Amino acid sequence: MLNFISKPVGCLKGEITVPGDKSISHRSIIFGAIAIGTSVIDGFLDGEDCIATLKAFQSMGVRIEGPDKQRVIIHGVGKYGLKQPQNIIDCVNSGTSMRLLAGLLAAQQFDSQLTGDESLLKRPMLRISRPLSQMGADVTTQDGKPPIVIKGGKKLNGIHYVMPEASAQVKSCLLLAGMYAEGQTKITENAVSRDHTERMLRTFSYPVQIQDGAIVIDRNGECHGTRLNIPGDISSAAFFIVAASITPGSDVLIRNVGINPTRTGIIHILTEMGADIRVLNQRAYGEEPVADLHIRYSQLKGIDIPASMVPLAIDEFPVIFIAAACAQGKTTLHGAKELRLKESDRIGAMVDGLNQLGVHAEGFDDGILIEGGSIQGGEVNSRGDHRIAMSFAIAGAVASAPVTIKNCANVATSFPSFVTTANMLHFQIEEYS
């Protein structure tokens, strides 16, 4: 078992980049694989989750070179060129791989099956199997959870689907199925979710319409190979945005970070708490906005986090809770029940961990209350969740004594170079087994 020890530090200073965006990396493989022609992807995240997606397409006959220095070259086979995999597709720990692949595979002429690790096998899949079945797909789960068994050769029909809650994975799953369905597939969102799929469709020259809060797609299009630069992942930058904000004397610059407006909830929340975050040198990598982020220490104050921020910061809440633990006053969050359905129950894991470190935290069914103050040393269990592990590693920098974090191997799913990058800013994080 891989564990971390994170020791208290003085201040954090320096300039870093973070690995490529995980959401965009997954999608670059998917659309590159079903494109006509070759795609060259730079900035690809070679973490375990995205490698699971890459290997899935290799098993379906797509030739993919790399990753080599974050470059991947994909030799697309076109929309109808995928071949039946010889084995069950293992999505390992990646819910994105499983949910997006399910939409694509539901439209193929061959049978397939998707499985994953112990954590993934606990995650809810009815949210995709039900609308796919409405489209005419034959998709079965085990009591609403993986593995997913898909019978190919089914004729899909477009539907108008009103999203019951914000979920980029469900939306993307249905858009991928809609690329093969008879008639239009229309998806209406009542709350904003990540729009990387819609942007990626445009990057690969596939027609998609956005009208009155709905996304419309049909099968009358093809993806075409392209060149793509992937920006740094704001979900990975989040750990260092918070770290610099809560560690006195800190001054950190993070270059080339994606600032897609459906992902910048952490900047809005921390700014409301009093953080000193400057967004510099704004530009674009294709369809995705990018900037450099300059963060300096500032005393934070507790706030009531608006529920409207939940889909815009869903993956960043564990480390936002660390910021709240260092803020003056109380921080509350409601409307975030989805956090209990991630790689772990992130509300439960953070409440337990914060209490272990002397911070008063209470969990609700859909949120949390944290009384800010000081973080003590101690030991916490990440529950095998990469974002919990990295969040408590950040806490160690400002704790009164070292923080030991158990069960950290899954950090490799999203940020394999986390410890190296952190220590460049003068963290003192050690790994041990």
From Swiss-Prot:
Q: Which cellular components does GO assign to this protein?
A: cytoplasm
Pathway field:
Metabolic intermediate biosynthesis; chorismate biosynthesis; chorismate from D-erythrose 4-phosphate and phosphoenolpyruvate: step 6/7
Tell me which residues bind 3-phosphoshikimate. 22-23, 27, 167, 169, 315, 342
Q: Which GO terms describe its biological process?
A: amino acid biosynthetic process; aromatic amino acid family biosynthetic process; chorismate biosynthetic process
EC assignment: 2.5.1.19
Report the function annotation for this chain.
Catalyzes the transfer of the enolpyruvyl moiety of phosphoenolpyruvate (PEP) to the 5-hydroxyl of shikimate-3-phosphate (S3P) to produce enolpyruvyl shikimate-3-phosphate and inorganic phosphate.
- Any idea what this protein is called? 3-phosphoshikimate 1-carboxyvinyltransferase
Provenance organism = Legionella pneumophila (strain Paris)
